[in-house]
Structures are given as structure tokens and as C-alpha cells.
């Protein structure tokens, strides 16, 4: 190791090294042991029974996948119908709330107009309604 860094050039790159992750001596030992399945010279010979077996397995798996796809399609169609129905229900509920709001505003306006025309203040009307409420509550609990 001391001979490698001799002469004070420890900061310089080793000129014999050409690969980042290869050995330091420059040999290409990784390529010697690598074998490829595509580059092999062994001939693979499948018999007709093996090929038929593989094909039948493939057809079975394709059939099962087809059934699963049909089930998913059916499920997604049912989900779409449910979502559309829910959206219609929500729209109807919104319309109902709007109509109720309009009716309550109109009723409150009519009540305020009635109170103004009668000459009795709103405080008096509130006291009367409170007394009637207390009377109903008293009858309810006894």
C-alpha cells in the first residue's frame, strides 16, 4: 500500500484503473463468470405433452382472468348506478332544503308583518309564545 502512494501523488488517480466498481488491477473478472440464458448453446427441447400442458394452463388462467374482469366490470357498473342515484338524492335534498328555507323566510316575514300591524311589540309576542311553551311542557311532564 505504501508503494501505491509513494512519491507524494496520493491525490492523483490510479492510471491503471478503468472501471469504477471493478478490481484495482484492471482485470475484468466480472465478465468471465457471467453467463446469459439467451447466449447459452444448450438446446431446449419441449415435448408435445409439455407444450399442451402449458397451453392448457394458460387457457385456464386466461378464462379465470376473463371471469374476474367481467366481475369487475359488473361491479363498476353497479357502483356507477349507485353513485348516480346518490347524486340525484343529494340534488333533491338540496332542492328540499332550499324550498324549506324560502318557506321559513316567508313565514318569518309574515309573522313580523303581523306583529308590526297588531301594534304589539315583538317582546310581547315572545313572552306569549314562551308562556304557551311552558304550559305545554307542564302538561307534558305531569
Swiss-Prot record:
* Domain t-SNARE coiled-coil homology intervals: 52-114
A GO cellular component entry from the record? COPII-coated ER to Golgi transport vesicle
Q: Which domain of life is it from?
A: Eukaryota
Kindly list the residue ranges recorded as spanning the membrane. Answer: 118-141
InterPro entries attached to this UniProt entry: BET1_SNARE, T_SNARE_dom
Q: In what ranges is there compositional bias, type Polar residues?
A: 26-36
Q: Where is this region: Disordered?
A: 1-36
Q: Which SMART domains match?
A: t_SNARE
GO BP annotations listed: endoplasmic reticulum to Golgi vesicle-mediated transport; intracellular protein transport; retrograde vesicle-mediated transport, Golgi to endoplasmic reticulum; vesicle fusion; vesicle fusion with Golgi apparatus
Q: Which UniProt keywords apply?
A: Coiled coil, Endoplasmic reticulum, ER-Golgi transport, Golgi apparatus, Membrane, Protein transport, Transmembrane, Transmembrane helix, Transport
Per the record, ranges on the Vesicular side are: 142
Entry's family note: Belongs to the BET1 family.
Subunit organization: Component of a SNARE complex consisting of SED5, BOS1, BET1 and SEC22 or YKT6. Interacts with SEC24.
Q: What is this protein called?
A: Protein transport protein BET1
Which species does the entry assign this protein to? Saccharomyces cerevisiae (strain ATCC 204508 / S288c) (Baker's yeast)
Amino acid at each position: 500500500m505504501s508503494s501505491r502512494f509513494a512519491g507524494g501523488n496520493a491525490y492523483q488517480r490510479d492510471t491503471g484503473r478503468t472501471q469504477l466498481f471493478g478490481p484495482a488491477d484492471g482485470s475484468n473478472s466480472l465478465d468471465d463468470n457471467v453467463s446469459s440464458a439467451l447466449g447459452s448453446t444448450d438446446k431446449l427441447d419441449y415435448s408435445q405433452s409439455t407444450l399442451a400442458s402449458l397451453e392448457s394452463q394458460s387457457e385456464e388462467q386466461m378464462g379465470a382472468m376473463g371471469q374476474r374482469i367481467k366481475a369487475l366490470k359488473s361491479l363498476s357498473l353497479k357502483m356507477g348506478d349507485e353513485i348516480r342515484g346518490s347524486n340525484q338524492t343529494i340534488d333533491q335534498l338540496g332542492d328540499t332544503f332550499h324550498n324549506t328555507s324560502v318557506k321559513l323566510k316567508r313565514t318569518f316575514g309574515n309573522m313580523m308583518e303581523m306583529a308590526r300591524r297588531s301594534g304589539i311589540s315583538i317582546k310581547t309576542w315572545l313572552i306569549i309564545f314562551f308562556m304557551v311553551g311552558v304550559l305545554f311542557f307542564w302538561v307534558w311532564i305531569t
